[in-house]
Amino acid sequence: MITYKRHKEIDFKKWDNCIESAINRNIYATTWYLDLVCKNWDALILNDYEAVMPLPWNKKWGVKYIAQPMFCQQLGVFHHSKKLDVDDFIKSIPKSFLYVNMNLNTLNGKSKFSVKENTNYELLLKDHDTLRKGYSKSHLKNLRRATRHELVIANPCDTADEFSKSKRNLALDFMTSKQFELEHDIVQTSLAFSKGEIFSVEGNDGICCSVFVLCGSKRLFLLSSYSNEESRKKGAYFFLLDYIFSLERFKGYVFDFEGSNLDGVAQINDGFGAELTKYHTVKFNFLNRFFRF
């Protein structure tokens, strides 16, 4: 039986145990991460936490609605059985939520309520020489360029403040102040919980390229990155990801590129030999057709 529970009614220990043991587990569905990125979240729960579905919600003009949080690519239903029907959960969303627009996860498949198919790339990290054989000619060329410029990995001394400050200087046209603040909180909390790492490349005048990855359940999630002009000229981004892939401690992990639906970004991810995966967006609206969010 699927039941709806408000946030205060959720057993968070059972929830996190369910997520950790789910066949489609990811860090976005853990309680600490949901608490960071969601102003409010309730849940649908099958029996005694056999499967769970977070419901991130908010209010606008007095109307309760469900929407995908920022920095949280995939949610949906997390479960142990391969035979689960995601639409059983979607149809159990209380009618008090008059508008729903959220992403499922890859293993949820397509729903009757799907309105969009999204692109993602994942790479199983194995022997480094084997991985490199899957790189595109363009990526190998970028790595040779990085070698010619004698790029080096920076000492791991970046803090959340340093990372956010550097990115803000380079991405003002692409992110809002609210997004910068939330990203900073995620980086800071993840570092404190040992659930994230910052990797950087040293340039002529300090850090020229940096990435932040979330770490959990044998998966790495490429949550954020930035590159300056020097980085782009020297192939630092390719050099940095190749370095991460080479680390022995990550062998057997899955590296999640976090997209992308943008062709240019998708081509870069594909060039590392990553596997194309899909996930769906579901949407429905019980509001007046003239009411828009």
Ranges and model annotations:
Residues M1-R6, I10, K110-S177:
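Acyltransferase donor/substrate-recognition loop-hinge adjacent to the catalytic core
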Residues N103-G109, H139-K141, N261-L262:
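Short, polar loop motifs at secondary-structure junctions
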